[in-house]
Amino acid sequence: MPPINEPTATTTSASSVWQGMTQLKSQVDLINIARGILSTPATTSTSCLDIQNSTPIIGSLASGKSQTPILTATMTPQIGLTGLGSLTSLPPELLLQFARLDGFNLLPAVGSPAIPSSSSCSEPSTSQASTVVSAPTLPPPSPLTSLPQKPAPLMPSGHVTTVDQQNRQQHQQQQRQQQQAQQQNSMARKYSMDTIQHHTMQHPHQLQYIPNHFMTASTDVFAAMDMSQKQSSPPGIFKIVAAKNEPSSSSNSQPGTPAMGDRRAVPACAICGTDSTGIHFGVDACAACSAFFRRTVVLNKDYSCNKGGKCTVVKDGSAGQKCRACRFRKCISSGMDKNSVQHRRDAIGKYSAGVKRELSPDAEFEPSAKVSTVSEPSTSSGPSGGFNQNVSSPAGIPRVPSTLRTTQASTCMNSACGQKSVLHELICRQNFLTEQRQLFYAGCLGDWFRKPSSIENQTLSELTDFSSCMFHLWKIEPRLAADFMNRNRYLDPLPIVEKLKIYRNFVIMRQSVEEPYLTWRHGGLEKRWFVMPNNTYIDFNNIAKYFENGALKDLKLDYETTTNLFLPSFTHAMDTIGEKMKKNNITETELTILLGLVLLDPGIYGIHESTRKFLKRIRDQLIHDVYMYYEDEMSHLYDPEIRMADIFMLVAAIKIHSIKTSENMHMLRVFDLIPADACFNQMLDVESVNVSPDGQKDSEAEQGPSPVSVPEAARGSYQDDDMPPVLEKNCDL
């Protein structure tokens, strides 16, 4: 045992011993655990610590498995027990017995025997029970078997000099009254929510809320279980942390704010170990872990661990190092209660007339505009997806409740499409479009009745007929894009002239997003294949064979012209978009995010200022939904915020490629290299899609069915016939 400088003994402090026990799990410094360790359990055979009358006691403490002293401490009546060493090799199974110390005075605890105090000037003892006597030498405390139910009174401390016995008794009575008041304050403090630190919430077996089972102090926190409960259930693992100091009564700080000079120790999160923000679902937890637990329970998530459930959730690790399966398992084992989670409330709610006018874009276009009702078999991508019939379209951008903002930014693949989330709405529209493609491009009759498979499992076919392929790309796909917009409830309030401007911008952008993505997912980057939405691919390694077998006979171009026209565009798309998609390994949800960003672009050329503000508000909500999606679904990544930025930066490359794609389309149309189609021409020419006040097309427009009808309530209150098309300014031939 290392040498210790013995402090000078002074006046004895009255004291009593409270014995409890706890189980420590890891190394903890003595000073941070407690200021009073009085004895060891019966499993130890080394010397124990005791309180003697004005005599310093030096002892050591060893575990039951090893006789090597691991703790050295000294006791003086002046300052109580002060540790001079540290725990260097504390085993997990070591049980310690603690005494409660408040400041510089040992206070009595419930169920503890009284130890009278004395000094060199004390009076001789009398027969009265309340008389101050010299403290006898105490034997080492016996092992804890049971705790008495009533505490013995604490005798007054210090030297009392009286001549008259009555005065002495009166003085002793005053001391006892002060001690009782002090005990009441102590009990109020140790059972206050501010000092207990809610350790009972961390215990898997609930402790009875009575004095002899649990105790805290203003400077240190101790936890204990009685022997009867120990025999019926294993002892809990308690975290020994410093209790919060109570603010002074004279403090002018607000409730819940520590006074100046108060030191408040923040309890650790029971899941990851970082600083907690309070009690969440029954345990001390940080905001991130509590939000994760709430999302998992509300969305009924089912995670799996790639390491067999052996991951470690630590506070110093980044979000990407937290396995969601192990993190949720630790939430449950720490005591988080699923029943405490409040599930989502009504997502629609009711708004006042003022809020409706503020949110509704119709107030800017047409005050009397009516809102149509969309009736569609809305689906989800999962096998359990149902239908949502007769969903009323909102009059404007709905306010998404905060409870939904933290949960709806997930993939939304297993929930209904009736929820108010911009990202969720886009995902539902993309899922419905995928099912429509299954019907149009099915290779056999059985495919009409099958659920759409994943992209990797789709069967590709090589180009055999250019005319059939162009029919798919320039007759079916533009109509699917229009249906994608028409079914989007967030765009329903817009007048038809504004929808057409958005559509002409979106239909080209959409092709520039999907084709590089499909090419990458089907391995086209390595094979130099160009994959189209109709599951047809062109092999750019051998374009000549398509001229030899007559697949491109309807193109009216020779081999050299075709190569010079399309090969640079393909190479540019794969280098600037496809390779970046491959590098980030983007998901189908992120593909939908890109489609939403190009659809809700407030910078579209020629749109009305009211439309621009309207699109900006929807896009801002989409960005918020995307942020929540990355916080939840992409939390396993090392830097999800960087990935989110990389996805957003793809929009610039998509816009550049869409310009090249538009130029190719104009060239094919102007030189009559593809079969004529009225809707295809209207899609590229603004003059052919402008709407006159009476609802008819302009006289110079080509004849043919309009891709969308013009309802009376959706025309808007202004005309903008002079606006050029969004692509005309870039592709003027």
Curated annotation (Swiss-Prot):
Residues 444-687 form the NR LBD domain. Residues 266-343 bind DNA. It is found in: Nucleus. GO terms for biological process: negative regulation of transcription by RNA polymerase II. Keywords: DNA-binding, Metal-binding, Nucleus, Receptor, Transcription, Transcription regulation, Zinc, Zinc-finger. Disruption phenotype: RNAi-mediated knockdown increases expression of potassium channel accessory subunit mps-2 and suppresses age-dependent memory decline. GO terms for molecular function: DNA-binding transcription repressor activity, RNA polymerase II-specific; RNA polymerase II cis-regulatory region sequence-specific DNA binding; RNA polymerase II transcription regulatory region sequence-specific DNA binding; zinc ion binding. Widely expressed, including in hypodermis, gut, muscle, and neuronal cells of the ventral nerve cord, head, and tail ganglia. Expressed in the head ganglion in several sensory and interneurons, including AVA. Its main location: nucleus. Residues 676-687 are annotated as: AF-2. One of its GO terms (cellular component) is nucleus. Residues 113-130, 165-185, 371-382 have a biased composition (Low complexity). A zinc finger (NR C4-type) spans 269-289, 305-326. It holds the Pfam family Hormone_recep. Residues 113-190, 361-396, 691-733 are annotated as: Disordered. InterPro entries: HNF4-like_DBD (IPR049636), NHR-like_dom_sf (IPR035500), Nucl_hrmn_rcpt_lig-bd (IPR000536), Znf_hrmn_rcpt (IPR001628), Znf_NHR/GATA (IPR013088). PANTHER family: NUCLEAR HORMONE RECEPTOR FAMILY MEMBER NHR-66, NUCLEAR HORMONE RECEPTOR FAMILY MEMBER NHR-86-RELATED. Transcription factor. Binds to regulatory elements and regulates transcription of target genes, including the potassium channel accessory subunit mps-2. Negatively regulates transcription of mps-2, thereby modulating age-dependent memory decline. In concert with nuclear hormone receptor nhr-49, involved in regulating target genes with roles in sphingolipid breakdown and lipid remodeling. Plays a role in modulating mitochondrial morphology and function. Interacts with nuclear hormone receptor nhr-49; the interaction is direct. Belongs to the nuclear hormone receptor family. This is Nuclear hormone receptor family member nhr-66. It comes from Caenorhabditis elegans.
